[in-house]
Amino acid sequence: MGIKHCCYILYFTLALVTLLQPVRSAEDLQQILPSANETRSLTTCGTYNIIDGCWRGKADWAENRKALADCAQGFAKGTIGGKDGDIYTVTSELDDDVANPKEGTLRFGAAQNRPLWIIFARDMVIRLDRELAINNDKTIDGRGAKVEIINAGFAIYNVKNIIIHNIIMHDIVVNPGGLIKSHDGPPVPRKGSDGDAIGISGGSQIWIDHCSLSKAVDGLIDAKHGSTHFTVSNCLFTQHQYLLLFWDFDERGMLCTVAFNKFTDNVDQRMPNLRHGFVQVVNNNYERWGSYALGGSAGPTILSQGNRFLASDIKKEVVGRYGESAMSESINWNWRSYMDVFENGAIFVPSGVDPVLTPEQNAGMIPAEPGEAVLRLTSSAGVLSCQPGAPC
């Protein structure tokens, strides 16, 4: 039996154990973390983390693109994007008619009412004239080309089942509203965008993987207004102040995963910042944040597991607690650290207790490796260079 096969069996076993546990006590919570023997077995899988190990290393990826749809982990697990639809190829960089886009443009494909797996014919720099409204059941797959999105970002509003993979987004600015194509019917009026690279509002089953994001006027990824069940994984975040803002305006139970990402090169805060909700922050690499790395308000649950925190010479504190009740109530917020690695004097001040997880929370947890493994697990964060006929 091959090493790779053994790794899959190990991960499946860990996931099965997770699913069979209805709730976790403080002691039970440690069971999502592998034992020393399990860690040694995981390490033999090579450089791939659990997500990349599902599809990378295969030379036929271009002929079998939709295999990626079986690889989502965390709270986006089960997200298949456009797997059940046709392949749609973007052949034009133009975005000169946002109300009635031409077939062959990214906007035309993203707006269709049917499932689509969207790919790109060649390297492209697409200057979006207005934010791009993405309809249900879409995969935007940049593998095999260098695809850059500039000027306006992606809008994932009140839709579900979306995969964004291997896309570069940078220099995103505020744009006016107007009549914009968002589905098969006539264009609809949309308000202006606030400068997010990826904005999620009321969306669910969203997976953002292997993207490189930098330099937006507002957030790199913002999720609000009832958004839930999304995973941000294997991404590279650089040169930005406000990175990931995950805000629920009531206690409906936002569930999100931040896994295997790298935050470096002049990043300041919100990696993520969570209001209400529950986030697993697992096996990420944080390097020299400005204000803080992990933050939140209004009593969110933050489980930090197996991350690497390399502090700058100026700012050492990993977490930031905010809001009117932060001083009086934050001592009860469940912000916990397990197997994290702290370098150059980095400090994580925990609060609350080890939470008892619901069955739904249990099902979305990714088994964490120790923080010492993070450099390996995040070594390919950001867009990949993928050529047909060779492994990515």
Curated annotation (Swiss-Prot):
Keywords: Allergen, Calcium, Disulfide bond, Glycoprotein, Lyase, Metal-binding, Signal
Cofactor binding notes: Binds 1 Ca(2+) ion.
Superkingdom as given in the UniProt entry: Eukaryota
EC number: 4.2.2.2
Protein family according to the UniProt entry: Belongs to the polysaccharide lyase 1 family. Amb a subfamily.
SUPFAM superfamilies referenced in this protein's UniProt entry, alphabetically: Pectin lyase-like
GO MF entries: metal ion binding; pectate lyase activity
The protein, known as: Pectate lyase 3
Signal peptide: 1-25
Disulfide bonds: C54-C71
Tissue: Pollen and flowers.
Protein's GO biological process: pectin catabolic process
Cofactor(s) this protein requires: Ca(2+)
Catalytic activity field: Eliminative cleavage of (1->4)-alpha-D-galacturonan to give oligosaccharides with 4-deoxy-alpha-D-galact-4-enuronosyl groups at their non-reducing ends
Active-site residues per Swiss-Prot or TrEMBL entry: R270
Pathway in which the depicted protein is active: Glycan metabolism; pectin degradation; 2-dehydro-3-deoxy-D-gluconate from pectin: step 2/5
